[in-house]
Amino acid sequence: MEAKRPEQTRVVVGMSGGVDSSVTALLLKEQGYDVIGIFMKNWDDTDENGVCTATEDYQDVVQVCNQLGIAYYAVNFEKEYWDKVFTYFLEEYKAGRTPNPDVMCNKEIKFKAFLNHALTLGADYVATGHYAQVKNVDGQYQLIRGKDPNKDQTYFLNALSQQQLSRVMFPLGHLEKKEVRAIAERAGLATAKKKDSTGICFIGKRDFKEFLSSYLPAQPGEMQTLDGEVKGTHDGLMYYTLGQRQGLGIGGSGEPWFVIGKNLEKNILYVGQGFHHPGLYSEGLRAIKVNWILRRESDEPFECTAKFRYRQPDQKVTVYPQSDGAVEVLFAEPQRAITPGQAVVFYDGDVCLGGGTIDHVLKKKEDRESA
């Protein structure tokens, strides 16, 4: 297919009211594209004491779009967000895991519901302020790390498909954050000095425990060591994540205590003393709901690197594809506090191969289900 010239190419930009998406729209406009800005409203904050900044954020989008001279709309994706992201978030916590809503939001909202809406506006592409790059190599789309190692967001984009990537532009992928700020300031954008948002959008500044308890009933239970010694009571397994140190309330002298495991059936929270407690370490993991961005030609084991949390340095691993579509991953070095529910994301150099959801850890390499 012959590539269209920029002025004949419509790009719909997902605008959050932040500096990254503002500069994304600016760069595309400067390159001559036909740009439309869309503000996604994903969460109903009317009953949440006005903690969410949606109204303020939309005003910033309006200001920036007026500065750039581009059309803008607000689109409501609250139902899709509730059904696809928030329900998943609660189900995972109920199952004792610690989910990553950003991965699901990118897969189901930003690059599905939003992309589909953009196509109805005649979009050729959608663009966002993510720090990542997409490269077309012989008709196959590769997801490549952003230039700024501190901001690279391929970890959160690991669930995207070829079809989604074929319609995506990431104009900030080759820039560092400080360059993006400088571009915004030079252009006098209304959002140039706005702070980056952090945390989970639907929780805002509220206390996480309080927020979760308003949706899921808490079941307090015993806090025990692996030997069965009771060290206190927990407020509900869903409030704790592996490796957590804060909020355990275990007194006494010596090294601090950490969460090292959960028993859902017996409602027991396992704790261990010391940062390097053996219960915190594992030699492998099993991941489910695996997405390969580039189709794998074989089910043979292969070596690559992986991240088990955002901003973690790459770790060497061997991946063993399973017949059910899951993978077992063995680590070159034991890993600390691997958390079920989080994403494991695979890399070959700077190319993101895909990822999956951590189902459980393998304490010993011999725990592998396949020979």
Swiss-Prot record:
Quote the record's binding site residues for ATP. G14, M15, S16, G17, G18, V19, D20, S21, M40, G129
Give the protein name, as stated in the record. Answer: tRNA-specific 2-thiouridylase MnmA
Tell me, which GO biological process terms does this entry list? tRNA wobble position uridine thiolation
Q: Which function does this protein serve?
A: Catalyzes the 2-thiolation of uridine at the wobble position (U34) of tRNA, leading to the formation of s(2)U34.
Location of this chain's protein in the cell: Cytoplasm
Q: Give GO cellular component annotations, separated by semicolons.
A: cytoplasm
The catalytic site is made up of C105, C201
EC code(s) of this entry: 2.8.1.13
Q: Which organism is it from?
A: Halalkalibacterium halodurans (strain ATCC BAA-125 / DSM 18197 / FERM 7344 / JCM 9153 / C-125)
Name the enzyme group at the top EC level. transferase
Do you know which CDD domains this protein is assigned to? MnmA_TRMU-like
Region named Interaction with tRNA: 151-153, 309-310
